[in-house]
Every structure is written in structure tokens, then in C-alpha cells.
């Protein structure tokens, strides 16, 4: 029996086959997990749909993690397909463009730091 056989895992932050989330999704699937995926905005929907198919999943959810309402809606929608969640992969990293431009710390503002921390660390 595989290590994660029958476990239900939500993967966030998958954007390409070079994403850490992609490697984690591969390992989870190889070990028997069922996977669901999130994306943010219509711009990424088709890409994540294709990745989900690669992992034999049709569970994809639009979720802006800066919105508590969207996070709550995500779990409500996921609950329509799964009766529980065994794991969540938080692989989301973001900072405003101006916060990462130029030399180290040149573009970093208090607000930019708050946004980066909220999305990259606090969101779930």
C-alpha cells in the first residue's frame, strides 16, 4: 500500500512543472493521494485544468487567498466533493513587483512586506 493511499490533499501554488508544488503533487500522486488544486483568476484556469488532468483530478478551484470569503468558499466547494481533507500544500509565494525590484531591500515598503507576508505565509 502506498504511503498516502486514499488521502485527500489540496495543492496550492502550482504554476508550472518547475514549481515546488508540482514536485510535491507528483510525490503525493505516486503515493496514492487524491488531489485538488487552486488557481487565482481566469488567466490561470486553463493551465491548472491541464495540470489537474495530468494528476487524474477534475477538482480545481479559483481562490484569491487575500480574501477570507474566497477561502471559505473554497472549502465549502471542496466539501461538496470530499467529506474531509487530509492535507494542504501551501506553496504560494508572492510579493508586489516593486518590493522585489532593484537591490536588496531598496523597493521594500511596510505595505509591500505586509502583502507578501499575508499571501505567502498567513493565507491559510
Predicted regions and their residues:
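Catalytic Tyr-X3-Lys loop
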Residues: 86, 101-124
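Conserved Rossmann-fold cofactor-binding substructure of NAD(P)-dependent oxidoreductases
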Residues: 66-81
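Rossmann-fold cofactor-recognition segment
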Residues: 52-69
Amino acid at each position: 500500500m502506498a504511503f498516502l493511499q486514499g488521502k485527500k490533499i489540496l495543492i496550492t501554488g502550482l504554476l508550472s512543472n518547475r514549481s515546488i508544488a508540482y514536485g510535491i503533487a507528483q510525490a503525493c500522486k505516486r503515493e496514492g493521494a487524491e488531489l485538488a488544486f487552486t488557481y487565482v483568476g481566469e488567466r490561470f484556469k486553463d493551465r491548472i485544468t491541464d495540470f489537474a488532468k495530468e494528476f487524474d483530478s477534475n477538482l480545481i478551484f479559483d481562490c484569491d487567498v487575500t480574501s477570507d470569503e474566497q477561502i471559505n468558499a473554497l472549502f465549502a466547494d471542496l466539501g461538496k466533493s470530499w467529506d474531509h481533507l487530509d492535507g494542504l500544500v501551501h506553496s504560494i509565494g508572492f510579493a508586489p513587483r516593486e518590493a522585489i525590484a532593484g537591490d536588496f531591500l531598496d523597493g521594500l515598503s511596510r505595505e509591500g512586506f505586509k502583502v507578501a507576508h499575508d499571501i505567502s505565509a498567513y493565507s491559510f
